[in-house]
Amino acid sequence: MPLSRLMIQQFRNIKACDIRLSAGFNFLIGPNGSGKTSVLEAIYLLGHGRSFKSSLTGRIIQNECSELFVHGRICEHSLSSDQFELPVGINKQRDGSTEVKIGGQTGQKLAQLAQILPLQLIHPEGFELLTDGPKQRRAFIDWGVFHTEPAFFDAWGRFKRLSKQRNALLKSAQSYRELSYWDQELARLAEQIDQWRESYVNQLKNVAEQLCRTFLPEFDIDLKYYRGWEKDQPYQSILEKNFERDQQLGYTFSGPNKADLRIKVNATPVEDVLSRGQLKLMVCALRVAQGQHLTELTGKQCIYLIDDFASELDSLRRQRLADSLKGTGAQVFVSSITESQVADMLDESSKTFHVAHGVIEQG
């Protein structure tokens, strides 16, 4: 489901742009600070409701403007197999308020936008997926579960709300009996979330490990899911057993909120073995594998956003990534300082856009 058209207004240094896009590769060429990353950021905002560079809305709205707009048209197929364009849009005010439009209807939810516009981001700091704590790897797993298990989003939201209530009760509870009622529902949700996550990782595992070996043939890659509490023990038993410790901490220590994807290379934690370039290549492999798996499972195509394509990658590794992306048949947006860095990827269906001072022109 590629974007056929993208309209951006008052976003960072982009005053206004309206561009027609390729369903294949779209190249954004320009020097640092030109606005090419802002185009990727705007697409990400359209699919996630937030920027990948700043959590502060005021920083992405153009100076002296009160709001920003990002609109797009998504190519869809109807039941009769006829193609049509679905208009989508997001408007953010400087006060942080957000309005989402889908098919011309206002008041839509961000989760609905994310569902119809699955995005994968690969950027220079992306290796943090492998080197930082488990939060990013949980988000990696949950991206896949969200797009393949319709009930996950509501279940995860309910689990987080109940966890917050439990943490508040921990401060005043005199005995575990005061929490047992809450913990029954919390445990039910935790077990369900764990089941979805484990099933997803088991399905993704073969695709991801195979693609990692294609990108990094010199290494043996292994992915393992950790659910966040002791294996083969019911979650409610864990909650009861750890009641006093949780009271001392002031929060619930174990649970789905501690889940992780543990990745090893040659039986050693990945961050202890790979160089920055190799880490980036592995992240690319994992992201592409997720997109491939999504297509195999649901028929949906995700959109890939790749910022600073040449960073940390030599020509051979760039070619491996390009070949894998072309093999997916997905829509891809690539930013690069020079056109020569992506020359081998250009074909008849691709489009090149030159970006300077926030102005985007097809070249």
From Swiss-Prot:
One term of GO molecular function? ATP binding
One Gene Ontology BP term is: DNA replication
Keyword hit for DNA damage: yes
Q: Which InterPro entries match?
A: DNA-binding_RecF, DNA-binding_RecF_CS, P-loop_NTPase, RecF/RecN/SMC_N, RecF_2
Q: Name one GO cellular component term.
A: cytoplasm
Q: Which UniProt keywords apply?
A: ATP-binding, Cytoplasm, DNA damage, DNA repair, DNA replication, DNA-binding, Nucleotide-binding, SOS response
The similarity annotation says: Belongs to the RecF family.
Name used for this protein in its record: DNA replication and repair protein RecF
Recorded source organism is Vibrio cholerae serotype O1 (strain ATCC 39315 / El Tor Inaba N16961)
